[in-house]
């Protein structure tokens, strides 16, 4: 009588152990993302900040003809932006550092059409640096968008511009 439960347990154990054999992973049919692509997808939500001359000139698109002196975000607080992004669950920030109008939010030497020629911090401001520093402080990623299109460029709209 005691042999029945023992045989039953042995049978069940052998069935369970046979189910534990390694399963062959199927071959990938489509391209498999690289590890860095998977990490990018895990980032999920970013803030995309479009802030520049248009903000102060009531324009959706700039034509590269707005006076830089109209740009003066005297109460700008990049840390406040980043705190808000973090509280909203954002994993990073992308700043439009130069849009199609050609205006640069950092003091570049490559064009006069930049923050260096504004009243903001007496021409000493650098919003790219300020936002980057705030992102580091609060532990989120930072990136910039630079438009390759530059409507402020003198030869814009000519064949030379395209070359």
Residue ranges and their predicted role:
Residues 21-163:
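Mature catalytic domains of secreted/periplasmic carbohydrate-active enzymes
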Residues 1-23:
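Bacterial Sec-dependent N-terminal signal peptides
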């Amino acid at each position: 009588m005691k042999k029945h439960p023992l045989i039953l347990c042995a049978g069940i154990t052998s069935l369970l152990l046979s189910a534990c054999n390694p399963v062959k992973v199927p071959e990938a049919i489509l391209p498999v993302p690289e590890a860095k692509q998977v990490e990018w997808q895990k980032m999920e939500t970013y803030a995309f900040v479009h802030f520049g001359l248009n903000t102060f000139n009531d324009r959706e698109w700039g034509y590269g003809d707005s006076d830089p002196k109209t740009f003066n975000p005297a109460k700008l607080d990049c840390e406040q932006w980043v705190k808000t992004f973090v509280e909203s669950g954002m994993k990073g920030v992308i700043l439009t550092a130069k849009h199609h109008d050609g205006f640069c939010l950092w003091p570049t030497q490559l064009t006069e059409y930049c923050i260096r020629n504004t009243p903001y911090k007496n021409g000493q401001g650098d919003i790219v640096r300020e936002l980057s520093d705030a992102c580091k402080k609060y532990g989120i990623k930072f990136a910039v968008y630079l438009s390759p299109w530059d409507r402020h460029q003198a030869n814009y709209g000519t064949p030379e511009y395209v070359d």
